[in-house]
Curated annotation (Swiss-Prot):
EC annotation from Swiss-Prot or TrEMBL: 1.2.1.41
Similarity-based family: Belongs to the gamma-glutamyl phosphate reductase family.
Gene: proA
PROSITE patterns with a match to the protein in the record: PROA
Pathway(s) of this molecule: Amino-acid biosynthesis; L-proline biosynthesis; L-glutamate 5-semialdehyde from L-glutamate: step 2/2
UniProt keyword list: Amino-acid biosynthesis, Cytoplasm, NADP, Oxidoreductase, Proline biosynthesis
SUPFAM superfamilies in the record: ALDH-like
Protein name listed in UniProt: Gamma-glutamyl phosphate reductase
Length: 417
């Protein structure tokens, strides 16, 4: 795509964003429900486009796990529409006053929620990101420019087309939801430098994509990190509970960022627990990559490498390490994790509190699966991503995280002395 064409997308989105700022909550919710209905009504078009993407994925030898991230079904399309409807039911943050006070000069000062403006989103395989991002940006008063990966090109394109058609039918600018129809690296890099039109850029995808955006972009970036998530089984853990949590965190959907990638286990329960968890994971054909002590206990495992401790597998692979203490577990996590989601399984209150306080991550759990780090599960509705940085937003990013604030000041003739 030519730079001039990309700038035109940006200009159109910027101008359209001002019209969105004039809509009240009722109008936005009505339009969101229209979009949801359009997605459901056009399921055959979506499935047809998705079939093209799946065919190309198979031709290029993409793994079945990654194809699952790409695949759409009637049920998943319905879930996408329901996600849009849920966003319509959420409280609108725009116009909310976070705080208000009167200063010594008699000025009434309020801090009010406002849209960020135009949001650019660069993302990979999962087509549901398209509808999640579009609906969240729309409800929070932002225009959006979407640039998906080549794997889901046809799916993303038809989804945006359907959303734009729904807006056009209601005499609303389709430029509120823009689509970059060029998946080349050069166009992506141009988008990352579109400072005149983009207010923020949000990458969603693997480590390489996020690293590229962070090192290339001149537009401000909100980092949605990869998920090298850990579960630590303490010496005071309920082992039956631990088994259920680990199987859920690893096997329910291994291709997502909140799936567990490494299991740490206290040495005092390793011999009792590792055979049990090996048997449970074997039903899902999970490959175990273990340290020396775990290898001595497992029946079938391969030696873990240094790279395994820092890898987000997104597959039926689990790295396993036996640790001497809670302190060693925390040190390992803080060294190798991606600041996403970490969990301890323990009935020891003091061990649990130490873990929750000392582990550096967007979400830390006690006796629960890391799979709950999700906008829906947190009650935010659809999410734009899981932020693993500490500035602006951290954790699942819902509507409030897609806003900024401005100060609104009421006076009565005051002049500063």
């Amino acid at each position: 795509m030519k730079v001039t064409d990309l700038k035109q997308l940006g200009q159109q989105a910027k101008e359209a964003s001002y019209t969105l700022g004039l809509m009240d909550t009722r109008q936005k919710n009505t339009l969101l429900n229209k979009m949801a209905a359009a997605i459901e009504a056009n399921a055959p078009r979506i499935l047809q486009a998705n079939a093209l993407d799946l065919e190309q994925a198979a031709t290029h030898g993409i793994s079945e796990t990654m194809q699952d991230r790409l695949r759409l079904t009637e049920e998943r399309i319905t879930a996408m529409a329901e996600g849009i409807r849920q966003v319509a039911t959420l409280p609108d943050p725009i116009g909310e006053v976070d705080k208000m006070w009167r200063n010594e000069a008699g000025l009434l000062i309020g801090q009010q929620r406002v849209p960020l403006g135009v949001i650019g989103i660069i993302y990979e395989s999962r087509p549901n990101v398209t509808t999640d991002a579009a609906s969240l940006c729309f409800k929070s008063g932002n225009a959006v420019i979407l640039r998906g990966g080549k794997e889901a090109f046809h799916s993303n394109q038809i989804l945006v087309t359907i959303l734009q058609e729904a807006l056009i039918q209601e005499a609303v600018s389709p430029h509120l939801i823009q689509f970059v129809d060029d998946t080349s690296r050069e166009t992506a890099q141009q988008l990352m430098r579109l400072n005149d039109y983009l207010d923020v850029l949000i990458p969603r995808g693997g480590a390489n994509l996020i690293k590229t955006v962070l090192t290339t972009a001149t537009v401000p970036v909100i980092e949605t990190g990869t998920g090298n998530c850990h579960i630590y089984v303490d010496k005071d853990a309920q082992l039956t509970m631990a088994t259920e949590i680990i199987v859920n965190a690893k096997c329910q959907r291994p291709s997502v960022c909140n799936a567990a990638e490494t299991l740490l286990i206290h040495q005092e329960v390793a011999e009792a627990f590792l055979p049990t968890i090996e048997k449970a994971l074997k039903e899902f054909h999970v490959e175990l990559r273990a340290d020396e002590r775990a290898l001595a206990i497992f029946e079938e495992a391969i030696p873990a490498t240094e790279q395994d401790w820092e890898t987000e597998f997104l597959d039926f692979i689990l790295a396993v390490k036996v640790v001497d203490s809670l302190d060693e577990a925390i040190q390992h996590i803080n060294r190798y994790n991606t600041k996403h989601s970490e969990s301890i399984i323990s009935d020891n209150y003091f061990a649990t509190q130490q873990f929750l306080q000392q582990v550096d991550a967007a979400a830390v759990y006690a006796n629960a699966s890391t799979r709950f780090t999700d906008g829906f599960e947190f009650g935010f509705g659809a999410e734009i991503g899981i932020s693993t940085q500490k500035l602006h937003a951290r954790g699942p990013m819902g509507l409030a995280e897609l806003t900024s604030t401005k100060y609104v000041i009421y006076g009565n003739g005051q002049a500063r002395s």
